[in-house]
């Protein structure tokens, strides 16, 4: 029963899907929901796949993929791309660590954040458009899983830059190998039914490598990770996965 509660809480935390169930959880146990982040990715990928099937015969591929990317942000409340924008605002402000963290917390977007958000959206649409039609559904199903697993991986290898403050602080420094192992097994088990395991492992390895580099770079700059930078990790890991799918298409 506790695991079901954690799964429901993960869905409520990571999406804007209407799940009218009140879950009570102790703050010290909140980090355990990270194990189920890939299931959130499965649900998001499934919804995006259904949307693709519904639209592909009525609109051009470019228009369909624009709808897909836009709706992916509707499903998550744009929390990850907002984190990406805040991260770029902070990191490219040329300020010290404390000022960068303050800028990331500011609800107002700066030029760097706006440009980063625009670039990530445009690049996602471009790469989705150029994925071969035969593996489009596969890419739509797998990419959100890889993005969420990358968040778990980043939390496992990083500490909180804010000393445990914020939502990210509830999990950073607490998520360990157990949570990542569960998330990893869920991801592998799901991918087994969608694409060849060797292909998934290659795409996942590249995405996790990018996640590692990004996480270590950010940690070097601000002393750890935050909820915003975890959002950036998701966006960059998803983009990496899409690039890999395009290379598979060639």
Curated annotation (Swiss-Prot):
Regions that span the bilayer: 33-53, 63-83, 109-129, 137-157, 180-200, 203-223
Q: Which UniProt keywords apply?
A: Cell membrane, Cobalamin biosynthesis, Magnesium, Membrane, Transferase, Transmembrane, Transmembrane helix
Q: Which Pfam families match?
A: CobS
Question: What is the membrane topology listed in the Swiss-Prot or TrEMBL record?
Answer: Multi-pass membrane protein
> Which cofactors, if any, are listed as required?
Mg(2+)
Specify the pathway: Cofactor biosynthesis; adenosylcobalamin biosynthesis; adenosylcobalamin from cob(II)yrinate a,c-diamide: step 7/7
GO MF terms listed in the record are: adenosylcobinamide-GDP ribazoletransferase activity; cobalamin 5'-phosphate synthase activity
**EC number(s) per entry:** 2.7.8.26
Provide a GO biological process annotation.
Answer: cobalamin biosynthetic process
**Cellular compartments annotated:** Cell membrane
Q: Which domain of life is it from?
A: Bacteria
Which reaction equations make up its catalytic activity?
Answer: alpha-ribazole + adenosylcob(III)inamide-GDP = adenosylcob(III)alamin + GMP + H(+); alpha-ribazole 5'-phosphate + adenosylcob(III)inamide-GDP = adenosylcob(III)alamin 5'-phosphate + GMP + H(+)
GO cellular component terms, A-Z: plasma membrane
Family to which the UniProt record says this protein belongs: Belongs to the CobS family.
Biological function: Joins adenosylcobinamide-GDP and alpha-ribazole to generate adenosylcobalamin (Ado-cobalamin). Also synthesizes adenosylcobalamin 5'-phosphate from adenosylcobinamide-GDP and alpha-ribazole 5'-phosphate.
Q: Could you tell me what this protein is called?
A: Adenosylcobinamide-GDP ribazoletransferase
Tell me which species this is from. Answer: Thermoanaerobacter pseudethanolicus (strain ATCC 33223 / 39E) (Clostridium thermohydrosulfuricum)
* Gene name linked to the record: cobS
């Amino acid at each position: 029963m506790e695991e079901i509660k954690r799964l429901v809480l993960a869905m409520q935390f990571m999406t804007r899907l209407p799940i009218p169930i009140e879950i009570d959880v102790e703050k010290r146990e909140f980090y355990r929901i990270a194990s189920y982040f890939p299931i959130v990715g499965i649900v998001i990928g499934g919804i995006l796949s259904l949307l693709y099937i519904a639209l592909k015969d009525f609109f051009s591929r470019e228009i369909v993929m624009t709808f897909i990317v836009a709706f992916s942000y509707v499903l998550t409340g744009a929390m990850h791309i907002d984190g990406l924008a805040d991260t770029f605002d902070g990191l490219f402000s040329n300020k010290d660590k404390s000022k960068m963290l303050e800028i990331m917390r500011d609800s107002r977007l700066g030029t760097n954040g706006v440009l980063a958000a625009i670039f990530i959206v445009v690049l996602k649409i471009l790469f989705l458009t150029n994925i071969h039609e035969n593996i489009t559904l596969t890419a739509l199903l797998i990419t959100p899983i890889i993005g969420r697993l990358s968040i778990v991986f980043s939390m496992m290898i990083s500490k909180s830059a804010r000393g445990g403050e914020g939502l990210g602080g509830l999990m950073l420094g607490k998520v360990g190998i157990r949570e990542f192992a569960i998330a990893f097994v869920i991801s592998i088990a799901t991918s087994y039914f969608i694409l060849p395991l060797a292909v998934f492992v290659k795409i996942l390895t590249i995405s996790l490598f990018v996640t590692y580099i990004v996480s270590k770079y950010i940690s070097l700059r601000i002393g750890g990770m935050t909820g915003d930078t975890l959002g950036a990790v998701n966006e960059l890991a998803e983009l990496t996965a899409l690039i890999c799918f395009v290379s598979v298409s060639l």
